[in-house]
Amino acid sequence: MDVNSRLSVQSNVESPLMHEGPEPQQITSSAAGNLAGSITACKKVLRSNSLLESTDYWLQNQRTPCQIGFVEDESENCASVCFVNLDVNKDACITENLQQKLVNVSPDLPNLISSMNVQQPKENEIVLLSGLASGNPQADFDVSQCPWLPDICLVQCARGNRPNSTNCIIFEINKFLIGLEVVQERQLHLETNVLKLEDDTNCSLSSIEEDFLTASEHLEEEIEVDDCRSGLENTNVSANVLESKKPKETTQEGWDYHKEKLHCALGEKHIRKHRTPSTKTEGSKENTEENTSLKSLNRLVRPSHLKSEVAGNKQLATNYSYPENIKGELETSQMLFIPRDAYLSMVKKDVLSPCSVLSEQGGSHRDHDVTPNPLPPVQNGEASTGEYATNLAESVMQDAFIRLSQSQPTLPQESAVSFSMRSALLPSGCCTKDMVVPRSWNELPKIVIVQSPDGSDTVPEPNVSSWPDMEFVETSGIFSADSSSRPTQSALEVALACAATVIGTISSPQATERFAMEQESLVSTYAQRGTGVQQTQVPQAFMAPSTTEYSFPSALCGMTQVASAVAVCGLCEKEEATCPVAPTDLLPTSGASEEISSIGSLVMERSTELGKEAIAEALLREATLILARPDAYSSLGELLESVNQRIIETTSKTQTLCTESVQRNELAHTLSNVILKHSVDELHQKTTMAHPTDERHPCGTLDTLMESVNQLLHNVICFTFKKMNHIVTLSEHPSFDQAAGQAWVKAFACPSSQPLSNAHGTGLVIRNLVEDASPKSNKGGARPELVNNPRLQSEFSCSHRMFDSTAKSFPKEIYLKGIMGEDTRNPHHTLNYDSNERRASTDLGKLTTASEGCSGFQETEDSIVPNTQEKYICATPLNNEAQVNLSLLGDDLSVPAQSTLEAKQSEVYGITDFAEELAETVVSMATEIAAICLDNSNGKQPWFCAWKRGNEFLTAPNGSCRSLKRKKENSSAGSTVRKHKPPRLSEIKRKADEHPELKEKLMNRVMDESMNLEDIPDSVSTFANEVAAKIMNLTEFSMVDGVWQGQSCSRTRLLGGDRWNRLKASSCESIPEEDSEARVFVNSLGLMSTLSQPVSRASSVSKQSSCESITDEFSRFMVKQMENEGRGFELLLDYYAGKNASSIMSSAMQQACQKNDHLNVRPSCPSKQSSTESITEEFYRYMLRDIAKESKDGASSRRSSHDWTTGLLSPSTRSPLCYRQSSMPDSRSPCSRLTVNAPVKANSLDGFAQNCPQDSVNVQPVSRASSSGLCKSDSCLYRRSGTDQITNMLIHETWASSIEALMRKNKIIADDSEAANASPGPVSSGSPLQVEKNANRLATSKGHRGPTLLVQESVDYQRKDAVTEGNHSPVSSPGKTAPVKKPSDFDPRRETSACHNAAGLNSPRRSLCSRDVPLIQIETDQKEECIGEPGPFLSQSGSLEETEGHQPEETIPDVARNEDTAPSTCQSSRDSLETSGEVEVEVLKEDIPRDESRNPPSSSEESTGSWSQLANEEDIPDDTSSFLQLSERSMSNGNSSGTSSLGIMDLDIYQESIPSSPMINELVEEKEILKEQSESIKEHASGLPGRAASPQRSLLVINFDLEPECPDAELRATLQWIAASELGIPTIYFKKSQESRIEKFLDVVKLVQQKSWKVGDIFHAVVQYCKLHAEQKERTPSLFDWLLELG
């Protein structure tokens, strides 16, 4: 077989996406060249002269069939390939139904197929497509849920109904071979690229700060590289896609221009990347062609997602889907307004400059171009981690630049430009465009300006192509405008300087100096130059704050916040979709949206002139006119002229309001986006249904859209006033009414400076406004009636604006408070609004949250600092911290989430999802911001000091951000990162004693001298508190890693900056606190107070530096340590002492938990955090004393204690897995209690190992809800971390040199000889490593079986397979291969063996029997081993069940199904096991088939604390410094079964076991298992682990048929099985939903295994069947039935 032709849509614009010709052009570019940067099509023609084509080859094939697995549709942990069968009846080929089916697979497909003429490939042809966007999530085809699908989609012509000749079968096999092989190779390529890129940039994506820092470090190289790579590639891709539809020259120009532009607008891309999701739902149904072009963008976006894919596939999926949707939306708008060519250009323009497209299309589109700009960023954003970092940096730059540049009033110029734009004057057009559509930070072009401050470059760019010029013009216009006027130039320079500062390079020192000096002048100038209405307004809003309190540090912090928020939103699947940052994107997506955005800008302008009711009315009229009648003006110039005239007339009169316009602008954009999105969605649905293949929507579409939009706007206004009334009513600020007027004025005067105060002030104002305007607004939002209160009227007239202005002071808070807050308080309210409204509000909330979360949040913080200083109403927010938190944080985030949740019940719209996303976004943002601030390298500085200080600490923000970089502890530039030495217990005690007040105020957090309680809380700290409070408010929706909140600087100090950085989020667990008022204290983030039951923390430190025994106090101390340090104490111990320390800690934690019922201890968290040995030693001493004391109590205890100590082996080799901690776990357990998941047993460590049946392990089921789902924070990209050799060495060295000796000396661990004696029998055969691994695995799997399992029960006799695999006792010391391990002679089938099976839990029960390892150790082992050795076990449960292939598969599925609920799993697994009829072993009361004795999947997880974050060893060695604890969700519940926890992780290993056996009933070759233990050990240890390590090697095969009846699904699945076996793929998975006869298939697989069939045998059987089928046709049974009969 060779490649006849290869069609590859490369980043190169030149390469046509698809040629119309009969055969695709041969392009040599490699399909995997770009990281999913383009659609690649490769047609392969099978030649009959290939070895693989010969029948003999297949008949004699002796390969062993690979394993078969079935996964739930949601599974997304392994590479996947979709075989799309294009066989259809000729007459049905063109039907819309088929087209829609293709669209469901991928919107790109129909266009690709038609353009490539592969509608009906020949039998020997196969077309490989990669880079496609995923299909419509709503479609009945589930593939869209698979993030991998978009990555690799194989379109092939199946045999279908054609004769089942041998040649046909071979062709099919070969096609499957090609598809699977390509997927494998591509996966490896992507894997390497992603890893390499991330390694290069040190981007673990663990935190925004890190990314940000990385970006600053690599900005210069990466901007160019990324611009070229991602910008060009992405652009090219989009261009290519468009290209097929539009003349190449134009595309090329546009793209070239865009490339430059993208280069400048990486940040924008980033933002857009996030925004794009907003349009997600709209475009999915768009025309396929348009979708295709958009998808190209999506593909571009995908790379970044690929990066994040490491973190979680779901994100990818989301990303894929949303870019498509966006594209669809864009296409739709374009379609609505533009002919195809125009549309193409528009898309390009969108990518390049929506404005140009708009100009091309008409005035209405002009605004749109801004939105399109975000799309290109999306494209660029996808490229690589490095690119991601760069994008982040650029995004920050852009924000700074936009803030500054937009502040410059260029409105007059803008209008002029608009005319010229219309006239096709590029330079003026550019200016005009920018001015016309100041898209707040959506306008990346400004970044371009950053590159060329003069703006001259920008102007020329627009010239490149007329339509792109428009957008560019806009950019240039801004630049040129800036350049034209000195103040403007200064603003630009300031922006550049700001951006440069963020990036770490200030090109113009003068600019920096001038920045502060000119800020005020610029602001005033801008205000005066109100002409810049939209732009000016936005900039002014920013400028005002900057002038008052704007400093580079604060700017940087704000930008960082924005960037982090954006990144967070973008990285989160849902967040991306929600990210309002892309509101413009939404707008650009549709012409209507464009119009709206322009209108929005106009509205913003109006808002600038809030004082003038006439202007507001005029603008609204203009907007309505524009939206409704794009042709009302012959050209944009006319429209702009009329609008500009009105605006200019009032500009001078509304200088004060100019600043507000920025925020209002953003709000307006957000609202317009929401509205447009909703309208466009409806329109799309209608048009798609009516004219699925029509590229252009019917003329009526615009009217319909207009009508819908107007209705929504009207509703918005009405609801806005209603909500305002509610807000006012609900807000508990009686004094606000009086201060309302003043506050309002202040808000306008210093909108940015008093965000917090305005939160309340705004509320007051709002109340007044509501009182004045609500009656009128109720009337349909009649603006005229608002005239009475001109400011309010204008503002209210534009509800977005109103929110903006309110939001401006406190944009997000008030806005959300109004929308969400009201809803939260009056859920029914939300429900009352029509679904459209609700949806709009939800979206709006989302957008607001996202965009404002970025800009608003930033603004809030920036302004907060000023605000407090300004002493506006800051006090009120502080006093009403809860209120503020709610409004600022809660309403913004949690409240919206809540309201959405409430709405969700009554609405179809995924309000729940939105709420979750919102909560996640908020939490992530808050966490990141807090982390940035917390990790402030200037040790003594309070939390957010960097923001507050101003220019003197120009580098501080960078420094603090840098310190966050997890990989580079000392990378903070210029800032000294103190290495904090964890205090000894004595120190902690001493300090605690010295500062008794700390115990109360700081919730008894142990403080070190660096903490200065005296520091007066500044606005920044206030903000931090509020953030914490807000996060706390979100706990219901997501258990926030609250620790960081609770963590004050002291904690940072205590843990040490680097460690804190790593721990900050994941370690955070909401811990119940006694003081509900804790939030009041500035230094305590107030996290704890919101939690439920109090944790007894009063006696925070033991009174004696050395404890005589593990007293209650000490236990409490340990618990507190864990709470305060995110389980850090245990982590520290674990780091040095390995599993033993961890085990001991578990015991200690159990004891502590016993005393604190509300605490559920889950200490098992591998971590690389550094610590001092002293703590470990001291702790061991306590342990030893306690043990000694216990030993005196009685013979039994003595004996047990002896057994226990004997069983204590040195820690088994730490699994080399790194757990990437996330700043925000994706799913947080809704329960507010700290879940420390340790086996809760207790009286003594020793007792834990005692052999009393009563010693049941109490694993309290804490909510497992959080156990699935990856973190969605940008900072929490979970990386499958690779082995960190250095870390391992360090651990083992430490162990060997100190801890081991210490323990041996104290008899904590037995000598080898003792251990050997202890072990009942020799270690089973197998390499020591394997044995050790197996033992570990066993230990892991032996975790507790159920929420309350008898210890002995927990012992799972590993299913035979597991046992045989590693008969060794689970515990294995690194040095000793498990001397004490379970005897090799242990026969899982022997009942007595139960005793011997020192598997651990069991042995504790019968300590007299071989007392292998103390339960504690096993517990630890389980955790680590489980993680480390998932391969062999596949997932504890999954592999167990799988390995237990002997057991009827049916049983296993049942067990697996229950896996999610550990307890039920145990039961069901037990039952099913019993049913299996395996030999039963009598374990206490229950008889469990030995086979089955292997733990149900959940058991190990329960004990291990659901290691959802298992990392793959091989994946990322570079994350050495970040062994992070599993985030809350993974830790959510010890109970969560392996599947749920595993499911969370990307662990492909677990993918197999994820749903546990039920999901993936993996058939392990029983014969192998039964034959040789050692052999099976090798196979499983090597094969499975290998698979685990590189899950990409396992593939998910998705089959999609245009006509489901057409192909023989069973035959096809069998052939795919053969192909996968030929390729050596360890396991191939099929989607359960697509395989109707799973049981039959499993039976066939079992049969094949029993008969030891090879691939040749299967092939032979298939050939025989095909012959039989050809002869008997109708009477032939199905293949599976026939095979089973044959067997």
From Swiss-Prot:
Modified residues (Phosphoserine): 1010, 1070, 1092, 1105-1106, 1109, 1244, 1273
Free-text comment about domains: RII-binding site, predicted to form an amphipathic helix, could participate in protein-protein interactions with a complementary surface on the R-subunit dimer.
Pfam families: AKAP_110
Disulfide bonding pattern of the chain: none
Keywords: Cytoplasm, Phosphoprotein
Cell compartment(s), UniProt: Cytoplasm
Coiled coil region boundaries: none
GO CC, alphabetical: mitochondrion; Z disc
GO MF annotation terms: protein kinase A binding
Highest rank taxon of the organism: Eukaryota
Organism: Mus musculus (Mouse)
Record-linked InterPro entries: AKAP_110_C, SPHK1-interactor_AKAP_110
Subunit structure, interactors included: Interacts (via the PKA-RII subunit binding domain) with the RI subunit of PKA. Interacts with SPHK1; the interaction greatly reduces SPHK1 activity.
Function: Anchoring protein that binds preferentially to the type I regulatory subunit of c-AMP-dependent protein kinase (PKA type I) and targets it to distinct subcellular compartments. May act as a converging factor linking cAMP and sphingosine signaling pathways. Plays a regulatory role in the modulation of SPHK1.
Start and end residues of each stretch annotated as PKA-RII subunit binding domain: 914-931
Keyword Cytoplasm found: yes
Protein name: A-kinase anchor protein SPHKAP
Predominant place of localization: cytoplasm
Biased composition (Low complexity): 1495-1508
Family according to the record: Belongs to the AKAP110 family.
